[in-house]
């Protein structure tokens, strides 16, 4: 056999002797550890991916208003709601409906109602000065806070591999080097 490879991400980290001619880096390509069991002091991994968007609409509603399909969330007070243009068709897990969160202006905003095909809503009542086009962090850093892939995937009843592989073709890939945007790649137009 001219080329041998048996090492996946975990064995690259923990099993030196199995590297052979090639390795299959998999999840460590994203800067993520393959499991909690691997030695984290061997490779200092940093997440290579963030998932960000922006607010497209804001509306204030009174107490008792149903939000999203089938009114799966009903407001219990006057609430300011922001619409986020990402949904399960983009790979954002529907299982985060009414239980996930995002970061806006360095603060957590809870997801309210269902994750729809193309959008979902968050409660931004307590985020001062929030406005349309504000950046929304679904995974990554915002100020001194962070939502990790592992956190989001765990909340969705999943794991990091499934989350990163599930991000759909509709989501443009923006490549950044040294803080500067280098290229944007669109798979669907």
Each language-model region and where it sits:
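Active-site anion/phosphate-binding pocket segments in diverse small-molecule metabolic enzymes
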Residues: 1-189
């Amino acid at each position: 056999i001219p080329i041998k490879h048996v090492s996946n991400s975990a064995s690259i980290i923990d099993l030196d002797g199995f590297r052979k001619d090639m390795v299959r880096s998999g999840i460590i390509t994203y800067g993520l550890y393959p499991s909690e069991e691997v030695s984290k002091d061997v490779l200092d991994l940093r997440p290579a991916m963030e998932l960000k968007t922006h607010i497209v609409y804001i509306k204030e509603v009174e107490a008792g208003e149903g939000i999203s399909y089938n009114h799966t969330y009903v407001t219990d007070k006057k609430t300011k709601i922001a619409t986020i243009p990402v949904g399960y068709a983009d790979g954002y897990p529907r299982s985060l409906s009414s239980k996930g969160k995002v970061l806006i202006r360095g603060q957590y905003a809870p997801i309210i109602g269902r994750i729809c095909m193309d959008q979902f809503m968050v409660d931004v009542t307590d985020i001062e000065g929030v406005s349309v086009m504000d950046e929304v962090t679904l995974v990554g850093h915002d100020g001194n806070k962070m939502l990790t892939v592992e956190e989001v995937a765990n909340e969705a009843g999943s794991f990091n591999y499934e989350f990163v592989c599930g991000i759909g073709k509709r989501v443009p890939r923006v490549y950044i080097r040294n803080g500067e945007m280098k290229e944007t790649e669109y798979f669907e137009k």
